[in-house]
């Protein structure tokens, strides 16, 4: 096990983007993407505590308690009995406010990397719990639907987050994911504030049915059922008004053969699931066309589901 006194010990990790909610599973479903990824380099320091170094131009806080990765590491270190100092350098390829888990990537990468430095003392559920403190900094809520797939990989169901995270990994058939990120910013905290706090029972019943059907479709590798279940009757009608081109992308993508999709996390990114790469490329063309007509800068990703979560680029070195 690496010792905190071995101050040359370091590790480099890739932390993946993630799609949260997966249309109908608000705060309880998510999956990891094979691209883009943040790169994070962690090493021990002589001074106990957390040091944050941002290697990009996003002007993110470096005070640990106000930084997503920093808050996650502070929670991690509170569970470590001996005094430990960790420096983390963050190079973000996942733009903050994009809706594809930028804050979760920082938090998940930080705790997985720190756990590697300390000899993997903590379990994945414990790492999720630490990383949720970072999400609280970003959104005001300690949620895990980006964190869990970022740490576990694949598709995850969050059965509960209290008193301890109860994460259920789900198998899924091969799926292609097309993501478009229109270059506007939607803050998670703002997107949560506009949500209704009370839901009519009729809509709740519809949503439960969709979540159950989506989980069943994934487990049974039933593409048709997956497509039918990708319906949100509670969150999407409220949040979609924040995203220009939402209806055009959704309708055009389904006409091109996509199984379905919707808002990634709180937006503004939109995602669509397809059974094959040819359909995913047709969906990408639809997305380009919509935002070119709207005159909005945008970026697309055509990728697949990342089954590993945060991965080591370079193992702990002495």
Please give the residue ranges for each predicted region.
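ATP-binding N-lobe of GHMP and related small-molecule kinases
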Residues: 2-98, 116-122, 153, 306-308, ...
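Gly/Ser-rich oxyanion-binding loop with an adjacent helix/lid
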Residues: 3, 83-164
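Glycine-rich beta-alpha junction loops
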Residues: 17, 35, 46, 181-186, ...
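Short beta-strand-to-turn element immediately C-terminal to the catalytic PLP-Schiff-base lysine
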Residues: 43, 149-161, 272-275, 313-315
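Short, conserved charged micro-motifs
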Residues: 48-51, 188, 278-285
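Acyltransferase
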Residues: 174-251, 255-256
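Glycine-rich, charge-dense phosphate/pyrophosphate-binding loop(s)
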Residues: 218-318
């Amino acid at each position: 096990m690496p010792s905190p006194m071995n101050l040359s010990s370091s590790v480099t990790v890739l932390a993946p983007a993630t799609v949260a909610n997966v249309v109908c599973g608000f705060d309880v479903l998510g999956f990891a993407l094979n691209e883009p990824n943040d790169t994070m380099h962690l090493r021990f320091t002589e001074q106990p505590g957390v040091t944050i170094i941002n290697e990009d131009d996003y002007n993110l806080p470096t005070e640990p308690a106000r930084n997503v990765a920093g808050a996650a590491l502070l929670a991690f270190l509170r569970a470590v009995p001996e005094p430990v100092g960790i420096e983390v350098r963050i190079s973000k390829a996942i733009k903050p406010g994009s809706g594809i888990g930028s804050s979760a990537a920082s938090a998940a990468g930080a705790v997985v990397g720190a756990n590697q430095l300390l000899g993997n003392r903590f379990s994945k559920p414990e790492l999720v719990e630490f990383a949720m403190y970072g999400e609280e900094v970003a959104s005001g809520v300690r949620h895990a639907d980006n964190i869990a797939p970022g740490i576990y990989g694949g598709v995850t169901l969050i059965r509960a987050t209290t008193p301890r995270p109860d994460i259920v990994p789900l198998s899924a058939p091969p799926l292609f994911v097309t993501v478009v990120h229109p270059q506007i910013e939607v803050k998670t905290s703002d997107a949560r504030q506009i949500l209704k706090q009370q839901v009519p029972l009729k809509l709740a019943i519809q949503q439960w049915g969709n979540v159950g059907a989506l989980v069943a479709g994934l487990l049974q590798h039933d593409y048709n059922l997956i497509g039918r279940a990708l319906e949100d009757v509670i969150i999407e009608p409220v949040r979609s008004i924040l995203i220009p081109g939402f209806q055009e992308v959704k309708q055009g993508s389904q006409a091109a053969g996509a199984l379905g999709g919707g808002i990634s996390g709180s937006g503004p990114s939109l995602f669509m699931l397809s059974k094959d790469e040819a359909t995913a490329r047709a969906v990408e063309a639809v997305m380009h066309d919509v935002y070119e007509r709207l005159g909005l800068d945008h970026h697309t990703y055509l990728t697949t589901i990342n089954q590993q979560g945060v991965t080591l680029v370079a193992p702990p070195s002495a």
